[in-house]
């Protein structure tokens, strides 16, 4: 921030653009790793990655054909039906923008009660359960709009499993690995290639 004389938002934009400018060096480092896969976290809010050309450039340059995007679901927002639908809409937008395999990941599940986590996972796996939860609420403009969005998401095929993860408990990474195996190798162990 000091070097470029910008605030936090400007620094995040510059960080995203610097990643694109230094892509060859980053690609070299990634390719030199003795790892079957690399998790690549992008700076700042998703808008910096999704809505700027540098995000698409990063995926294309690093290899869209071997990329998977993990969309992170906030646990607090996901606890309500309308909150989850809002996140599903954002996820669908990212999926349309990049058109690569996609994982829905519920983060910080240690912040949720078991029942809350299970409800979110059930809603993600079955849109009809989510619609039922909305319809059980007092009808409002927000709930009606959510049902309309849900109809669009259903036609888009947005009903997908959500993978719960917790860094506090170290849970969920094996599920992400297994899902990546399913996507690219039909369940076989990942291999460099």
Question: Where on the chain are the PLM-derived regions?
Answer:
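Phosphate-binding beta-loop-alpha motif at adenosine-nucleotide cofactor sites
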Residues: 40, 160-170
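Expand to "…catalyze enediolate/carbanion chemistry for C-C bond making/breaking, isomerization
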Residues: 17-20, 27-28, 84, 157, ...
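Interdomain boundary/hinge elements
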Residues: 132-136, 188-193
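A short helix-to-beta-strand connector/capping loop
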Residues: 35, 156-161
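Conserved GTPase G-domain signal focused on the G5
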Residues: 168-184
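Nucleotide-state-sensitive switch-loop elements of NTP-binding domains
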Residues: 1-57, 63-68
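Conserved catalytic-core segment of NTP-binding enzymes
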Residues: 47-155
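Core catalytic machinery and nucleic-acid-binding channels of phosphodiester-processing enzymes
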Residues: 33, 37-39, 68, 74-76, ...
């Amino acid at each position: 921030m000091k070097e470029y004389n910008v605030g936090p938002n400007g620094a995040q934009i510059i960080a995203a653009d610097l990643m694109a400018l230094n892509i060859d060096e980053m690609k070299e480092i990634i390719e030199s790793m003795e790892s079957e896969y690399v998790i690549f976290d992008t700076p700042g809010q998703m808008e910096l990655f999704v809505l700027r050309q540098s995000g698409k450039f990063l995926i294309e340059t690093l290899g869209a054909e071997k990329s998977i995007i993990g969309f992170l679901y906030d646990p607090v927002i996901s606890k309500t039906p309308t909150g989850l639908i809002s996140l599903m809409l954002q996820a669908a937008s990212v999926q349309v923008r990049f058109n690569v395999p996609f994982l829905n990941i519920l983060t910080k599940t240690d912040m949720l009660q078991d029942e809350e986590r299970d409800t979110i996972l059930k809603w993600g796996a079955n849109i009809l359960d989510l619609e039922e939860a909305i319809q059980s609420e007092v009808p409002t403009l927000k709930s009606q709009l959510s049902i309309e969005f849900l109809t669009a998401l259903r036609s888009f095929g947005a009903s997908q499993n959500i993978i719960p993860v917790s860094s506090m408990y170290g849970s969920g990474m094996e599920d992400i690995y297994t899902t990546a195996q399913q996507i690219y190798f039909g369940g076989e162990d990942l291999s460099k290639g």
